[in-house]
C-alpha cells in the first residue's frame, strides 16, 4: 500500500509566510498606481517596502520592532534636515536640484520620508504577522545558493564603484546641462555624478543610485520570497492578488486616458499617450500582459489540481477569464508589443502548455480545457464586439508604412547611436544612469534624428533597447552579473519545459517574451513592471523546484 512521503503532507501557512506575503501583497497592490520611475518618492517607497520584506524573511519578531524603531529615527532625522533646509533657502529641499516651487511629484517632504515610512509600514505589518521569536535558520542557506541574490549584490557593488569614481559631474538648470570633468582613477570603472531626482522643468533626472533604487525594490521582493521559502500556495495567492489588481486598474485606466493635467504632480507632456497612471501606453500594455501571463499560469495550476473534475467549473475558469480580459485590455492600450506578446501567449504558449505540460494528465483535463476554450471564445467575441481597435489598427498600419519606406523601424537610429556610444567604452561603460546625459552627442550624428538645420530634434532619454542601453552604461564587466542570472534562468526554463510543470511553462515563456520586448522598447526602468516581474520569477522558481511530479516520485510503492 502506498505510503505518502513527509513532504506530501499539507502543512499550515507559517507566520513568516504570512509576514512576507502581506508585504508582497501590499507592493503588488500599490505597484500600478505610481508613475513608474519618474516620481522619486514612489521609487523610494517601493525600495523601503522591499527592504522591510527582506528583514521580515530573515529576522525574528523582536527584530521587526527594533527595525521599526530604526525607521522612526530615520524619519525624524530626515524631517529635521528637511525643515532646516527649507528654512530661508533660495533653493529649498533636502536633495540637490530641488526647484523653488513644489508639486506632489517633487515635494521634498515626500522624497525625504518615503523610504523610512514605507519601511516602517512594512516592518509593523511583519511584526503583527510574525510569531517566530528568533531569526530564521533557513534564510541564509537558501540565499547562499541563490544566483540572483549574488548577482544583484555584485551589480550593486559595481554601480557603487562607478559612482564613487566619477569622471564627471552634470550641472543642470532648466533643461540645459553640461558635464564638468572630474579627477578619477582611470583603470577602475568610472561613472557620472548626475542629479538623483527631478525638478518641475525636467522630470528626467537619473544616476546610478536612482537606478539601484528602481531595481532594488523588486529585487528585494524576490530575495525576501526566496529567503522565506514561500510555498506554491502562497505564491498562487499573491498571483491572484496581482491579477485582481491589474483587472481593476485595466478598467480604471481604460476610462481615464487624459491628454492634459497632471499625474502625481507632473504635467502630462503634449505628445504623451497616457493610460491611467502610465505616461506611456507601452508600459501599461506590458503591465497588463505580465498579469495576463500570471492568470494563464493560475489557470494551468488550478486545472491540473482539478483533474477530471475540471469540466464542472472552478478557479481555472475564473483565471482563464482573467487572462482573456487582461489580454484584451493590453491590446486596447494600442501597444504593438503588447498585442504581439498576448497573441503569442494565446496562440502558441497555451497550446504548448497543454501538449507539453499535461502530457501525463491530458485525458483528465481535456473536458476542462474544452470548457475553458468555449468560455474564452465567447468572452473574446463579446468584448471584441464592443471594443474599438481602430487606433491600434491605424498605429500598426503607420509603423508598417514607415518600415516599407525606410527599410527599418523608427527606433533604429536610436539603436545605432547607442551602439556607437557603447563601443567607445565597451569594458566599463559610461556609468549607470548616464545614458540621457551622454547619448545626445551620439544621437545628434544620426540624420533621422536631426531637424531641418542639422541639429538634434529631440533628446531621447532612453535607447528603447534596454539591453543595449545597459551595455552602454555598465559595459561588459557590469553585464557579468546579468549573464550569471541569465544562466540561472536558463536552468529554470529547461526545468519548466519538462512534463509535470504546466503552470511553470507560461511563466517561463512570459519572461522570454518580456526580454524580447525589452529589445525594442523601454521596460526595465519602471517599478510597476519590475515588481510583477519579481513575482513571476519567484513563482517560476518555486513551481519548478516544488513540483508535484517530484513529490509523486517520492511516494513509496
Name these PLM-found stretches.
Residues 2-59, 64-88, 107-131, 147-169, ...:
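Alpha-helical transmembrane segments of multi-pass inner-membrane proteins
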Amino acid at each position: 500500500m502506498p505510503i505518502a512521503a513527509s513532504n506530501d503532507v499539507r502543512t499550515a501557512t507559517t507566520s513568516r509566510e504570512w509576514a512576507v506575503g502581506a508585504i508582497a501583497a501590499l507592493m503588488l497592490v500599490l505597484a500600478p498606481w505610481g508613475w513608474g520611475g519618474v516620481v522619486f518618492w514612489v521609487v523610494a517607497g517601493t525600495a523601503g517596502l522591499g527592504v522591510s520584506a527582506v528583514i521580515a524573511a530573515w529576522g525574528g519578531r523582536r527584530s521587526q520592532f527594533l527595525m521599526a524603531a530604526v525607521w522612526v529615527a530615520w524619519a525624524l532625522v530626515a524631517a529635521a534636515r528637511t525643515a532646516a533646509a527649507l528654512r530661508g533657502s533660495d533653493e529649498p529641499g533636502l536633495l540637490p536640484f530641488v526647484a523653488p516651487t513644489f508639486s506632489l511629484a517633487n515635494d521634498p517632504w515626500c522624497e525625504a520620508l518615503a523610504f523610512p515610512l514605507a519601511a516602517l509600514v512594512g516592518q509593523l505589518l511583519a511584526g503583527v504577522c510574525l510569531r517566530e521569536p528568533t531569526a530564521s535558520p533557513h534564510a541564509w542557506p537558501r540565499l547562499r545558493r541563490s544566483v540572483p541574490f549574488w548577482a544583484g549584490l555584485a551589480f550593486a557593488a559595481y554601480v557603487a564603484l562607478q559612482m564613487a569614481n566619477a569622471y564627471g559631474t552634470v550641472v543642470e538648470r532648466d533643461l540645459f546641462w553640461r558635464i564638468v570633468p572630474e579627477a578619477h582613477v582611470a583603470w577602475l570603472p568610472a561613472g557620472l555624478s548626475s542629479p538623483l531626482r527631478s525638478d518641475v522643468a525636467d522630470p528626467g533626472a537619473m544616476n546610478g543610485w536612482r537606478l539601484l533604487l528602481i531595481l532594488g525594490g523588486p529585487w528585494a521582493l524576490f530575495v525576501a520570497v526566496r529567503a522565506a521559502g514561500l510555498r506554491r500556495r502562497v505564491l498562487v495567492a499573491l498571483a491572484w492578488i496581482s491579477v485582481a489588481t491589474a483587472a481593476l486598474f485595466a478598467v480604471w485606466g481604460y476610462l481615464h486616458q487624459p491628454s492634459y493635467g497632471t499625474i502625481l504632480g507632473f504635467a502630462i507632456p503634449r505628445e504623451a499617450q497616457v493610460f491611467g497612471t502610465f505616461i506611456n501606453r507601452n508600459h501599461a500594455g506590458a503591465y497588463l500582459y505580465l498579469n495576463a501571463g500570471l492568470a494563464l499560469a493560475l489557470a494551468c495550476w488550478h486545472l491540473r489540481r482539478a483533474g477530471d473534475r475540471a469540466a464542472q467549473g472552478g478557479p481555472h475558469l475564473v483565471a482563464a477569464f482573467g487572462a482573456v480580459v487582461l489580454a484584451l485590455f493590453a491590446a486596447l492600450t494600442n501597444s504593438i508589443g503588447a498585442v504581439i506578446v498576448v497573441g503569442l501567449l494565446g496562440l502558441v504558449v497555451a497550446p504548448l502548455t497543454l501538449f507539453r505540460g499535461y502530457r501525463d494528465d491530458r485525458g483528465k483535463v481535456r473536458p476542462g480545457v474544452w470548457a475553458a476554450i468555449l468560455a474564452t471564445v465567447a468572452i473574446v467575441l463579446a468584448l471584441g464586439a464592443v471594443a474599438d481597435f481602430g487606433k491600434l489598427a491605424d498605429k500598426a498600419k503607420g509603423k508598417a508604412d514607415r518600415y516599407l519606406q525606410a527599410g527599418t523601424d523608427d527606433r533604429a537610429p536610436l539603436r545605432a547611436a547607442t551602439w556607437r556610444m557603447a563601443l567607445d567604452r565597451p569594458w566599463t561603460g559610461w556609468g549607470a544612469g548616464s545614458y540621457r546625459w551622454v547619448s545626445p552627442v551620439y544621437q545628434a550624428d544620426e540624420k533621422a534624428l536631426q531637424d531641418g538645420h542639422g541639429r538634434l530634434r529631440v533628446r531621447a532619454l532612453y535607447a528603447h533597447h534596454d539591453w543595449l542601453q545597459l551595455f552602454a552604461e555598465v559595459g561588459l564587466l557590469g553585464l557579468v552579473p546579468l549573464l550569471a542570472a541569465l544562466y540561472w534562468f536558463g536552468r529554470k526554463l529547461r526545468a519548466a519545459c519538462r512534463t509535470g510543470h504546466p503552470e511553470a511553462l507560461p511563466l517561463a515563456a512570459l519572461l522570454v517574451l518580456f526580454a524580447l520586448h525589452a529589445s525594442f522598447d523601454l521596460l526595465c526602468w519602471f517599478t510597476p513592471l519590475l515588481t510583477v516581474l519579481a513575482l513571476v520569477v519567484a513563482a517560476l522558481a518555486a513551481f519548478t523546484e516544488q513540483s508535484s511530479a517530484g513529490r509523486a516520485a517520492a511516494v513509496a510503492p
